[in-house]
Design a protein with these regions (language model features):
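Extended hydrophobic
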Residues: 206-257
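Cys/His-rich microdomains that often coordinate metals
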Residues: 2-5, 22-23
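Short cysteine-rich clusters marking metal-coordination/redox-active sites
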Residues: 1, 16-19
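Residues immediately within or flanking Cys/His clusters that coordinate Zn2+
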Residues: 13
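Charged, low-complexity helical/coil segments in non-catalytic cytosolic or luminal regions
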Residues: 8, 29-223, 244, 274-275
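Short Cys/His-rich micro-motifs in 6-15 aa windows
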Residues: 20-28
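Surface loops and adjacent helix of pleckstrin homology
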Residues: 10, 28, 238-240
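Juxtamembrane boundary at the C-terminal end of a transmembrane helix
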Residues: 262-276
């Protein structure tokens, strides 16, 4: 078991403790655990650190010494995902309100029924209980045109994890179904939904390994985890807030608003005092 900070992974690619070279434990990727595809890393370790630094600097109120790279642990990891293809379809009942065109003091309420369908292809969802689903979702999208047929050579130098959530497990399918049915609902309904009868069917489920740089740092006794898309560089993770910066911003904002109000008022008083 290896990991980044407290982030533990069931590895199928690991490292020699003596020379640091990569060693692939092939038997862990046999049978149903053998991926269909792999998406290779295109973002280097240094690039990932640059993405992390920019992510911190672009955010407001982050303590200046939080993103000191001396405190960062980083590891390139192939995360197990499944790509789901299929169709969502069904019927929705909705209603929306609109100000009456004949009497602006009245509200017209419209009810209606809509039916529709939507095909979807290669919707990603991680299949690891150890990975935070929201964090993995937040670093999408990935370019699936760059997928390669799985080969152990791509794992060299990286950690990798085999899936521990069944690709057709009911909760996993519901997660994807909810996502697609929400998209269909947005396409069909204006206003609120009063009832819905939607369902999703799956025509293909592909097992792939996705490139993610996992970063971990400790700050004031708390551990912070970040993920960098190993293909695009998209970076996400929770950032701490420096109280001093927040209060400084509040002070400057208060002074600015006060100046906007007080200065015109001052000149108005001067002008009124000069009126005979």
């Amino acid at each position: 078991m290896f990991g980044v900070g407290g982030f533990r992974l069931s590895t199928v690619a690991t490292f020699c403790a003596y020379c640091g070279s990569a060693d692939i434990i092939k038997e862990r990727l046999e049978g149903k655990f053998r991926p269909d595809y792999v998406l290779p890393f295109t973002i280097s370790k240094d690039d990932a650190l640059d993405c992390y630094t920019k992510h911190c600097k672009d955010a407001c109120f982050v303590p200046g010494h939080f993103f000191d790279l001396k405190n960062i642990k980083i590891q390139g990891t192939y995360v197990p995902f499944c790509l789901y293809s299929g169709r969502s379809e069904g019927t929705l009942k909705g209603q929306f309100e609109q100000t009456s065109s004949t009497n602006r003091d009245m509200i017209d309420v419209y009810s209606y029924v809509r039916s529709g369908k939507m095909d979807f292809a290669r919707i990603p969802a991680d299949v690891s209980v150890k990975m935070d689903n929201a964090l993995m979702d937040s670093i999408e999208p990935f370019d699936f045109n760059q997928l390669k047929e799985f080969n152990y050579a791509y794992l060299s130098g990286f950690l990798a994890e085999k899936y521990d959530v069944e690709r057709d497990e009911s909760g996993q399918l519901k997660r994807v179904s909810d996502r697609m049915e929400s998209s269909l609902q947005q396409e069909l309904i204006k206003g609120s939904v009063s009832s819905s009868d939607l369902k999703s069917t799956f025509s293909a489920i592909e097992y792939v390994l996705m490139p993610v740089w996992m970063l971990c740092t400790e700050f004031e006794g708390k551990e912070y985890i970040f993920a960098v898309n190993g293909q695009s560089g998209t970076t996400e993770g929770f950032l701490p807030c420096a109280a001093s910066k927040k209060w400084l911003w509040f002070f400057i904002l208060t002074i600015s608003i006060s100046a906007v109000i007080i200065i015109p008022l001052y000149f108005l008083i001067i002008w009124l005092s000069n009126i005979d």
